Structures are given as structure tokens and as C-alpha cells.
Amino acid sequence: GLFDIVKKVVGTIAGL
């Protein structure tokens, strides 16, 4: 769902 997309974005930022 939409929250999954948000989590993906947060994970990408954390990956930086």
C-alpha cells in the first residue's frame, strides 16, 4: 500500500 512506498523511501534515505 501507500505506507509500503513511504517505508521504501525512508529505507532509501537511511541507506545514504
Curated annotation (Swiss-Prot):
Positions of modified residues (Leucine amide): L16
Tissue: Expressed by the skin dorsal glands.
Any one GO CC term of the record: extracellular region
InterPro entries, sorted: Aurein_antimicrobial_peptide
Keywords of the record: Amidation, Amphibian defense peptide, Antibiotic, Antimicrobial, Immunity, Innate immunity, Secreted
A Pfam family per the record: Antimicrobial20
Presence of the UniProt keyword Secreted in the record: yes
GO biological process: defense response to bacterium; innate immune response
Signal peptide: none
The UniProt record lists the keyword Secreted: yes
Localisation per UniProt entry: Secreted
Domain of life: Eukaryota
Function, as annotated: Antimicrobial activity against B.cereus, L.lactis, L.innocua, M.luteus, S.aureus, S.epidermidis and S.uberis. Probably acts by disturbing membrane functions with its amphipathic structure. Shows anticancer activity. Strongly inhibits the formation of NO by neuronal nitric oxide synthase (nNOS) at micromolar concentrations. Acts by a non-competitive mechanism, probably by binding to calcium/calmodulin and as a consequence blocking calmodulin attachment to nNOS.
Recorded family membership: Belongs to the frog skin active peptide (FSAP) family. Aurein subfamily.
The name this protein goes by in its record: Aurein-2.4
Taxonomy of the source species: Eukaryota, Metazoa, Chordata, Craniata, Vertebrata
